[in-house]
Amino acid sequence: MIKTKESEDNEMKIVILEADSLGEDMVFTPFEALGEVVIYRTTTADEMEAKTLDADVIVANKVPICEETIGKAKNLKLVCLTATGFNNLDGDYLKKRGIAAYNVAGYSTNGVAQHTFALLFYVLEKLNYYDNYVKSGEYSRGSCFSHFAQNFFELDGKTWGIIGLGAIGRKVAQIAEAFGCHILCYSASGSKYNTTYEQVGLDELLSRSDIVSVHAPLNAYTENLMTLEKFPQDEEDRHFSEPGKRCNRQ
């Protein structure tokens, strides 16, 4: 535990629960202008009660925020998440107690979109295989300039299905279009997107898409959304990526 300064009378207490999840270069000094600041590097669910007992504000990432973990935090007024997803919060309980909760919306749009393509190209381009092949010296020793042991296809002309067309999904669609892909989209909640992309049902998206990526929050609509049975079993060269919130949990 790090206590940045001594508390003063009637000063708000801010408890940062998972500092390590933010990286070693994170600076917390701006919080000191708002009140007493206590920093914990990590926090488990079992440690929550003791660490939040007299907190006015807690700053968390993935630790569960519910009656079992903050039920005795009688001064708690605000939960700040250093992430986008709300799936670790019991929203009904927080609303019942009048505790506000805020996330960091939109901070990762470009990064997650970039990572989506990093995952795709690693698999699609067989990068692990060809990296090892070149490093082994086999390419240099080979008698033929070409090597076709692992084939891959171009994105141009392929169909990319996107589950969840929020900010990240739209960014992925924009990049995929630049590669020449046709975009399909699906809304797990049944909402109609304001988009020119073709919106279809889940089964149609899975059957028509060469590539499928999920960019949806983990909630009641997406829990167990993806199961093995939903994927076409007779197709090869299809790619599925889920840089979202574990919508294929069993």
Where are these regions (language model features)?
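N-terminal Rossmann-fold NAD(P) dinucleotide-binding loop
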Residues: G169-R170
